[in-house]
Amino acid sequence: MTAYFITATGTDCGKTFITAALLAAARARGLSAHAYKPVMSGWRAEDTASDAHLLRAAGGNQQSLDALSCYRFAAPLSPHQAAAKEGTTIDWEQLVGWCRTHVATATPQSPCYLEGAGGVMTPITTTRTMRDLAAALAIPVILVSGTALGSISHTLTAIEALRAVNVPIHALILNESADSTIPLAEAHTAIAPFVRSIPHCLVQPHVASLTQAESFAALL
């Protein structure tokens, strides 16, 4: 499989950093990789530290900001709330179709990464969630989790939610939380017995640079 849906156990787990790292690692290997964030909230075009700018930079600035997403909203809320703030709604069929168009272009030499918003069960519309989008696309998920206290429960809950609708999980990435009091190795050891059926379980130390993308080579 050459297309992946990146989601998380919740907000601020580092999905965009991980997606950008995957993209940078793929491109470093000579692959023509692309990343997209179908729905963005908290969007500000002038914010050069935004998710969109990070993904664009990791991709060599080859994509326009408009090409990165199908929907963008200003309010930093769940997509359905952010859309309502602007007096609109998200067209589910349009969103799925937009994503499928990009998934269809993925090849071994040109992998595609689609990054969700928020967590697995973050609402997109009043009846659909990020889990539903992953299921509709029928592509494997890369699940990002933090390591702060409570993350084991959050992670296992997210895994069960995905499995309940037969979404395959390709990888679990433990992205070290900035405020975690639990050593990364201990966090990995604690959750490992519960995730043995997931093909890849990787750890990512808390860093501020994409230069440490080498740990993601196993996913490519």
Regions of interest found by a model, annotated:
Residues E160-L220:
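C-terminal lobe/tail of nucleotide-utilizing enzymes
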Residues K37, I142-S145, H170-E176:
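Short internal beta-strands
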Residues T125-A148:
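Inter-motif core of Ras-like GTPase G domains
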Residues F5-L22:
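Glycine-rich phosphate-binding P-loop
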